[in-house]
Each structure stands twice: as structure tokens, then as C-alpha cells.
């Protein structure tokens, strides 16, 4: 309780005060024991995810920043006390903590061992996969610096392409870089493939990428992006914003998929959900002429199949 009283003031956590005191006054074993206690506190979730090979969660939900700081602190402390032989065990046990990965890569770069650094970067990125929820972004950028020094333009383009497709990343700077690097005569085909190879889309990503597609006048790419994001609460608003850039065929394809989703929803929906379904029907009705016609046909279908649901019929008529 006394320790909590210190923590509640938010000036400094007592563990940090205790560690600072031990760092100055305690012998090495006492200080390391204190560090190990803190490391253990942050270790359980990390080891569980590594054992289950849940690296998507390891990089997106649990960044383990505090664990990483403590491990680097321990490694540096061991070195200053001539106990470098103990650090290999730490590096192996916690080799997937992002800070530990970066520590190894940065050391190799500081020593001028670029080939070894590239191998370490590739090995680390491979663990998390191309789409590293931003965890792999700094390693891709380090790799780009090395490749640029070697004038390896093709692989620089490939790294920027991999960065563009990442989840939760600002894609705009990477599109601009790619536009500078890719030959003008190859750009049209390249950018169409680029827009078609984005594995995860959020609402923000959807808006950003759709705006890029419109700027590049590659309107045929809009359908896939909107389809990938069609379970979003904002799907109708987004379709309405970009529908007029799409071909009538693509407008119809998107509308039919939304109608199919609504049809499935209606098959099990309770009365409290009717308002949301009817709101989507009304929204799709106003998006474009193609969706308007298809929605009118769907409303007739709903009236025929669910005419015995007065609450739903009342909302539709209103």
C-alpha cells in the first residue's frame, strides 16, 4: 500500500526509484536480481505468444516496450561489469522482442558488418512476416539505407512496396518514393498491382488508398479496396463517396455484395436490428443509379419474404 501511494502521485514508479538506488549502491548481483524481478513481471505474455507462434499479436497487441528496455539495460550492465558471456543466453531467450532485434542489428551496422546486418534484418522480418503491424517498418528502412548505398534500385523498390502494403502505416510517403523510383513506362502496371496487394484495410487506409487511386485515375482498383472494407460501419458512406468513379459493372458488384450481406442479416435479425438494416438500405439507395435500381428490387424481395414482420415493414414504408 505504501508503494502504491508513491505510484499514485505519477511522479515516478517506485520500481524505477529502487532500481536507480541499486544501480548506484548495490553490488552487481543484487542489481541484476532486481532487474530480473522486473523482467519476469513482463515475460509471461511474451513467452506465451512466442510458444504459440502468434507473431501478429506479438507485434500488434503487445509491443513489449518495457520488457525491451529492461533487457537492453541488463545487457549493457553485464558488459560494463565484464560479464559478456551471459548476454548470449538473454539474446536467445528473448530474440523476438523488437528492441532486442534492433539492438543486434544496430550493433552489426555500427561495426560496419552490412552483410551480416542484412541477414539479421531479413531473418527478423521473416519471423513477423511482411505485414508487421509497423513493428518491421524500421528494419525495412534500415535495409533500404544499405541498399541505397549499394545502388541496388530494384531491391529498394521492393522494400518500399513491402512498406506500402503494411497494416497501420502511413502509405503516402511510400507511394511518392515508389513514383520517383519506378520507370515512367512501368508505372501504370506497377501501381495497379500495388493497389491490388494490400492485405489489411481499415477505414483510414480505405480513404487514403481510394484517394490515391482517384489521383492516379486507376478507378478499376476501387472495387477491391471497398470490398475488402465492406464489413466496416462506414461502408455505405465510403461507397457513396467513390461510386461515381466506378464503372456500372463495379457499382453493381459492390451493391450486390452489400445486398447479400443484408439478406443474410435479415435471415436471423431481431426487431432491434431492423433500424440498422433499413438505414443501410436507404444509404445504398442514394449512392448511385445502379445501386438505386438494385435496392428497389431488394426492397420488393424483403416485402415479399418478410411482410409478416410489421416492425420491419413500418420502417421500410417510412
Where are these regions (language model features)?
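Eukaryote-biased, non-catalytic alpha-solenoid scaffold regions
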Residues: 1-318
Amino acid at each position: 500500500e505504501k508503494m502504491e501511494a508513491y505510484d499514485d502521485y505519477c511522479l515516478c514508479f517506485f520500481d524505477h526509484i529502487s532500481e536507480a538506488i541499486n544501480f548506484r549502491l548495490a553490488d552487481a548481483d543484487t542489481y541484476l536480481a532486481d532487474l530480473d524481478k522486473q523482467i519476469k513481471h513482463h515475460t509471461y505474455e511474451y513467452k506465451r505468444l512466442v510458444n504459440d507462434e502468434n507473431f501478429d499479436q506479438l507485434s500488434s497487441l503487445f509491443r513489449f516496450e518495457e520488457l525491451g528496455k529492461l533487457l537492453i539495460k541488463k545487457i549493457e550492465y553485464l558488459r560494463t561489469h565484464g560479464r559478456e558471456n551471459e548476454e548470449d543466453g538473454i539474446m536467445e531467450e528473448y530474440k523476438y522482442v523488437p528492441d532486442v532485434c534492433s539492438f543486434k542489428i544496430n550493433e552489426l551496422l555500427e561495426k560496419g558488418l552490412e552483410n551480416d546486418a542484412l541477414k539479421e534484418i531479413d531473418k527478423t522480418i521473416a519471423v513477423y512476416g511482411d505485414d508487421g503491424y509497423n513493428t518491421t517498418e524500421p528494419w525495412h528502412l534500415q535495409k533500404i539505407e544499405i541498399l541505397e548505398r549499394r545502388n541496388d534500385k530494384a531491391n529498394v523498390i521492393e522494400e518500399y512496396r513491402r512498406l506500402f502494403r503494411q497494416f497501420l502505416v502511413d502509405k503516402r510517403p511510400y507511394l511518392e518514393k515508389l513514383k520517383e523510383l519506378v520507370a515512367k513506362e512501368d508505372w501504370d502496371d506497377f501501381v495497379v498491382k500495388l493497389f491490388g496487394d494490400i492485405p489489411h484495410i481499415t477505414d483510414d487506409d480505405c480513404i487514403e488508398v481510394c484517394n490515391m487511386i482517384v489521383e492516379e485515375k486507376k478507378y478499376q482498383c476501387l472495387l477491391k479496396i471497398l470490398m475488402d472494407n465492406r464489413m466496416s460501419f462506414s461502408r455505405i458512406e465510403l461507397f457513396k463517396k467513390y461510386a461515381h468513379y466506378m464503372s456500372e459493372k463495379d457499382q453493381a458488384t459492390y451493391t450486390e455484395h452489400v445486398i447479400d450481406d443484408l439478406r443474410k442479416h435479415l435471415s436471423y435479425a431481431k426487431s432491434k436490428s431492423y433500424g440498422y438494416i433499413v438505414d443501410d438500405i436507404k444509404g445504398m439507395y442514394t449512392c448511385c443509379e445502379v445501386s438505386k435500381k438494385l435496392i428497389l428490387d431488394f426492397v420488393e424481395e424483403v416485402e415479399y419474404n418478410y411482410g409478416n414482420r410489421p416492425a420491419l415493414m413500418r420502417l421500410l414504408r417510412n
